UniProtKB/Swiss-Prot annotation:
InterPro entries (alphabetical): SecB (IPR003708), SecB-like_sf (IPR035958)
Annotated PANTHER family: PROTEIN-EXPORT PROTEIN SECB, PTHR36918
Record's subcellular location: Cytoplasm
Superkingdom of origin: Bacteria
A biological process term (GO) from this entry: protein transport
Gene Ontology MF annotations: unfolded protein binding
Protein name according to UniProt: Protein-export protein SecB
Keyword vocabulary terms for this entry: Chaperone, Cytoplasm, Protein transport, Translocation, Transport
Task performed by this protein: One of the proteins required for the normal export of preproteins out of the cell cytoplasm. It is a molecular chaperone that binds to a subset of precursor proteins, maintaining them in a translocation-competent state. It also specifically binds to its receptor SecA.
Family per similarity comment: Belongs to the SecB family.
């Protein structure tokens, strides 16, 4: 009696590629900005996007926009879109959403942070080291907002 071959149900995750998709650095008020006392106000905006490229293969984009103002004037604006191609197979929907919305951005963030730091230094501004981001907490907040919004729509 032949036994049926067991189906492979083991989850699989792999990084295929990490790449820089888009980058921009603007210093609209230089060189005048270099003559002023440096007391920066740093604003960080971030966003993630993901899309399926093929069966079990996903592109995740982490977009970071850093705007630094000094004395109410923009010193510089830096935007980086750090991309990654990931294999994520045999995951339940919730696990896949967490993987694409938190785990992959955690992998991409150090690359984007290094690119921003390098661009800022090349613009001859003081080095900017972005603090780590807790993408797991951001993802949980997103899920809570989605649940609250669905609850409000049903009421």
């Amino acid at each position: 009696m032949a036994e049926a071959a067991p189906q492979d149900t083991q989850q699989h995750f792999a990084i295929q590629r990490i790449f820089l998709k888009d980058v921009s650095f603007e210093a609209p008020n230089s060189p005048v900005m270099f003559q002023k006392e440096w007391n920066p106000d740093v604003k960080l905006d971030l966003d993630t996007q993901s899309r399926e490229l093929g069966e079990g293969v996903y592109e995740v984009i982490l977009r970071l926009t850093v705007t630094v103002k000094n004395a109410e004037e923009t010193a510089f604006l830096c935007e980086v879109q750090q991309g990654g191609i990931f294999t994520a197979e045999k995951m339940e929907a919730g696990q896949l959403a967490h993987c694409l919305g938190a785990f992959c951005p955690n992998i991409l963030f150090p690359y984007a942070r290094e690119t921003i730091s390098s661009l800022v230094v090349k613009g001859t501004f003081p080095q900017l080291n972005l603090a780590p981001v807790n993408f797991d907490a951001l993802f949980m907040n997103y899920l809570q907002q989605q649940a609250a919004q669905q609850g409000a729509e049903q009421a």
